């Protein structure tokens, strides 16, 4: 992308599309004083763990500075933070609380994305990786073995167990093959729709966080909103199936919110390019027209690597 078309770092004005509690969190993230507590070493880009304090309120958060982003061949430099904020805006417009409150602001090391920290629920090694009737790991010889939250490995010679959806075959230590599955979970299904909308090219298992009170969040949305089809995800279990009625209703709300000169469109225009805003609207329209979950296109790897 030529330099003039790149989206420069800058502040975003966040009109409250979330319920009041989330709105107060975005005010805290936007106006609070950031203090860096440490760096998350396993992240591919510079990710700092911080606390933010504003008007007597304190919260933990993640700060990803634009200057710490690694160059990518297919995304313009210095735009990943803006894409993370755009993903939050779109998720809020859908009416789903699947992405933690996220803002664009100045930080101790320059402009970047600041996102509320999510405390992930501890998962015991023997627990099933998903809810809703999934068999217990070890219940029988073909039962799924959890590999992370909402993901599991199952017998490659059998269909996906009840309560799980097949993703594909995976090599396991020792040279064997297992069936990688994800939970047949309504929260994951919403996230699959969101990923199709924002054209997420990196939905890995490690980007799924569950909380002690049963909420699900997706994180790491920097490689999104490309104008070309780059959907790459683990959540293919519903491919080709009709969209749930609640997803169709949410997409209809989003289509309305993306109207010309609408507040959401104005906010997105400060975060991604005009062509990317147009492509976003086209994807929403295509999902509504088809009424089904997308299927892998074949021109782009369908599953990210590593998947978990």
Put a short name on every predicted segment.
Residues 180-184:
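Helix-boundary and loop/linker segments of multi-pass membrane transporters
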Residues 186-191:
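Alpha-helical scaffolds flanking conserved acidic
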């Amino acid at each position: 992308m030529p330099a003039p078309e790149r989206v420069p770092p800058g502040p975003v004005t966040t009109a409250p599309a979330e319920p009041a509690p989330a709105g107060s969190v975005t005010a805290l993230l936007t106006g609070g004083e950031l203090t860096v507590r440490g760096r998350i070493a396993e992240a591919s880009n510079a990710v700092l763990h911080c606390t933010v304090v504003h008007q007597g309120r304190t919260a933990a958060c993640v700060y990803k500075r634009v200057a710490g982003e690694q160059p990518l061949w297919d995304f313009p430099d210095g735009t990943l933070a803006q894409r993370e904020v755009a993903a939050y805006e779109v998720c809020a417009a859908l009416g789903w609380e699947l992405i933690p409150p996220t803002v664009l602001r100045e930080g101790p090391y320059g402009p970047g994305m600041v996102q509320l920290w999510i405390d992930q629920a501890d998962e015991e090694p023997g627990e099933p990786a998903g809810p809703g009737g999934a068999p217990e790991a070890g219940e029988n010889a073909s039962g799924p073995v959890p590999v992370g939250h909402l993901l599991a490995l199952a017998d490659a010679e059998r269909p996906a167990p009840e309560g799980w959806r097949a993703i594909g075959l995976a090599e396991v230590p020792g040279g064997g093959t297992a069936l990688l599955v994800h939970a047949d979970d309504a929260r994951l299904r919403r996230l699959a729709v969101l990923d199709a909308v924002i054209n997420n090219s990196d939905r890995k298992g490690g980007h799924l966080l569950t909380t002690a009170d049963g909420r699900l969040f997706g994180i790491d949305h920097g490689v999104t909103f490309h104008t070309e089809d780059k959907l790459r995800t683990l959540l293919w279990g519903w491919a080709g199936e009709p969209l749930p009625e609640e997803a169709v209703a949410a997409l209809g709300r989003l289509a309305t919110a993306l109207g010309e000169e609408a507040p959401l469109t104005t906010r997105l225009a400060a975060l991604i390019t005009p062509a990317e805003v147009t492509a976003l609207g086209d994807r929403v329209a295509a999902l509504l027209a088809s009424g089904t979950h997308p299927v892998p296109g074949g021109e782009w790897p369908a599953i990210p690597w590593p998947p978990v």
